[in-house]
């Protein structure tokens, strides 16, 4: 959740023509990570069920990394901003991967 507000604010700086494209995709992807974890935990009837939601959260994490790289390539964010957010999302990805591997 700590990344949600800074990422949302970052996406609002994108050009108007990206409002319903890359910026919106980024906002949806960053929100889906904690939402999938919470929904999966709330609906867990088995380890398999919860892991499916964790896998979706991991997919959204990887999607965020790509969106940030695209935003950098298009000049919407600086290299520093991209590296910082990408590093944070890589950490989230590693945490989700470990949780997926260890959840019983």
Language model region names:
Residues 1-104:
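Amphipathic alpha-helical assembly/interaction segments
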């Amino acid at each position: 959740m700590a990344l949600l507000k800074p990422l949302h604010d970052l996406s609002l700086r994108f050009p108007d023509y990206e409002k319903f494209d890359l910026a919106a995709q980024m906002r949806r992807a960053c929100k889906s990570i904690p939402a999938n974890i919470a929904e999966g935990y709330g609906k867990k009837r088995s380890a398999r069920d919860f892991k499916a939601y964790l896998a979706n959260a991991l997919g959204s994490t990887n999607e965020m990394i790509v969106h940030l790289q695209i935003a950098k390539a298009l000049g919407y964010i600086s290299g520093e901003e991209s590296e910082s957010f990408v590093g944070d999302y890589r950490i989230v990805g590693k945490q989700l991967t470990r949780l997926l591997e260890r959840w019983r």
